[in-house]
A protein has these predicted regions:
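Active-site segments of SGNH/GDSL-like serine hydrolases
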Residues: 60-67, 73, 95-128
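Conserved SGNH/GDSL esterase-like catalytic core that processes O-acyl groups on lipids
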Residues: 1-92, 114
Length: 128
């Protein structure tokens, strides 16, 4: 029986959501996070992940800070994380990791959002 969580990836999460406590009520927060938080409403995803004593860390976060804005036609600036906020939050994430862990790790780059399949069209006669 597995008793320890090793993958803290959460669908749809933004960088800032790694740093704030998640509500214990799944209807008021990220559903998956409220189910695995060690202390809902107090602990953070990043804190819970670092508390497991990881030996390797993959930081692949940030896509969702732009994805909703891009797929929504860039029509709602309120859902776009500003460059300043993104930088502050990502620096806080990396700083927390470097200050709390001796694990090896990789920080993945965010691909150009327009390179995802959502933004490609295929002509009706493309497949013979």
């Amino acid at each position: 029986v597995k008793t320890q969580l090793n993958n803290f990836g959460v669908p749809g999460i933004t960088v800032g959501e790694l740093l704030v406590p998640t509500s214990a009520n799944p209807s008021h927060s990220l559903y998956y996070t409220s189910r695995f938080a060690t202390n809902p409403g107090v602990s953070t995803i990043l804190g819970d992940a670092l508390a497991t004593g990881p030996t390797f860390i993959l930081v692949e976060i940030g896509n969702n800070d732009i994805l909703g804005y891009a797929t929504g036609g860039a029509s709602n600036p309120a859902i776009l994380t500003t460059t300043a906020d993104f930088t502050t939050r990502m620096n806080a994430v990396i700083g927390s990791i470097l200050g709390s862990s001796t694990a090896s790790g990789v920080v993945a780059n965010i691909p150009n959002v327009t390179s995802i399949p959502y933004f490609f069209t295929v002509p009706w006669n493309a497949i013979p």
